Amino acid sequence: MKNLDINTFDNIEDIPLGSSEQDPYDFFTLSDRNVMNSDMKKNIVQWNSRYSYNQLKNKDSLIMFLVEIFRSLFVSNCIDKNIDNVLLSIEEMFIDHYYNPQHSRLKYLIDDVGIFFTKLPITKAFHTYNKKYRITKRLYAPPTFNEVRHILNLAQILSLEEGLDLLTFDADETLYPDGHDFNDEVLASYISCLLKKMNIAIVTAASYNNDAEKYQKRLENLLKYFSKHNIKDGSYKNFYVMGGESNYLFKCNEEATLYSVPENEWRHYKKFVDYDTVQEILNISEKCLEKVIKDFGLCAQIQRKEKSIGLVPNKIPSLNIKNEQKNYMIKYEVLEEAVIRIKKEIIKNKITAPYCAFNGGQDLWVDVGNKAEGLLILQKLLKIQKKKCCHIGDQFLHSGNDFPTRFCSLTLWVSNPQETKACLKSIMHLNIKSFIPEVLYENQ
């Protein structure tokens, strides 16, 4: 940990705060003006509102693009011979996109590709992964979607040589199983260790208004670990929780409990959305969800909160009852259908306020605000550049609420807390000379 180089900015002037000009997309004004302009902010809004069949499972465009390249090499039986030349070409495209994200060749080939805030060493990442799993020696099983996802994660981790100032996490399926509370001492130890070197935030869709106790309950075991290891050195001050995507901010005090941060300390970094617009988004969503329940005969209910609305099963499935009926479960494809219907209606009503309609796997939620806005608030509050911020999450498809963070942060796409631990272990040991990235395949 001693060698993890974390740089901070002494003055707010060190980071330009973007244009003061107001436009319909000003909630995406970023901390370094030279990376994102108004057209790119508009592009984020358009992709946040995109709806198509292609957003279904494992349809990430960049990963599928690489899968097809590797698969063509595999089919032609020349992956072992030609892989270096192919990786060099891919890396050149990545570098071109890093310098010119709006007009790169990669952008023309993959129109929804995110922004690269670091140069991705895909060649080194592939060979690291191949050294352990020997992809190039396989005869009948071509590289898969998840393998390419892991390789891109490795490339992103290997690009962090300058260190990080802010590490953010999704909650469910990233830090703990969906619907559960945090309960992993090893993961807590990794987060605690990194907290001594950087700011860490959990950016979650969970919306309990400003009720710090409810967030405290979900994270109780993590905060207990902080009470033993992060109070004396004051590193507990580096921990944040952003609830409701971007609507409620909490910090940790010296008793390792959460408290609500006064709005006057951070609300000016957030786009103002008036009450009528909030209600319009929720009303449109509620009408769509009522129609979905009727059309598909769902055993589900609508839950409406201050700035969010959700479709949840009437009963959560039990893992212990084998013969229990499962007809109350909502099919993944039905949730996707509902997300697309809601986005379509919001677009028709020409609403430009930040929002997020996402498929949670077992339920669906629509929030006023989104994780991109949540990350941008933290970046501005802490005066941190986007290339020094990394978000770890499991919902990076177009219908997932982590997707917008690709336009304002580095990202690592995990599928479970075990993969999160592997990523953190690699980040902790990144600048050690004998460092070998932790490679964790999905089924291990």
Curated annotation (Swiss-Prot):
IMP binds at D170, D172, D178, T204, S207, S308, D363, K371. Changing D394V: Loss of catalytic activity. Changing D178V: Partial loss of catalytic activity. One of its GO terms (biological process) is inosine salvage. Changing Y176L: Severe loss of catalytic activity. Optimum pH is 4-5. Keywords: Allosteric enzyme, ATP-binding, Cytoplasm, Hydrolase, Magnesium, Metal-binding, Nucleotide metabolism, Nucleotide-binding. GO terms for molecular function: ATP binding; IMP 5'-nucleotidase activity; magnesium ion binding. The keyword Glycosyltransferase does not apply. Changing H398V: 4.7-fold reduction in affinity for IMP and 1.4-fold decrease in catalytic efficiency at pH 5. 6-fold increase in affinity for IMP and 7-fold increase in catalytic efficiency at pH 8. Increases catalytic activity in presence of ATP. PANTHER family: IMP-SPECIFIC 5'-NUCLEOTIDASE 1 (PTHR28213:SF1). Specifically, catalyzes the dephosphorylation of inosine monophosphate (IMP) into inosine. By dephosphorylating IMP, plays a role in the purine salvage pathway. Does not have phosphotransferase activity with IMP as phosphate donor and adenosine as phosphate acceptor. This is IMP-specific 5'-nucleotidase 1. It comes from Plasmodium falciparum (isolate 3D7).
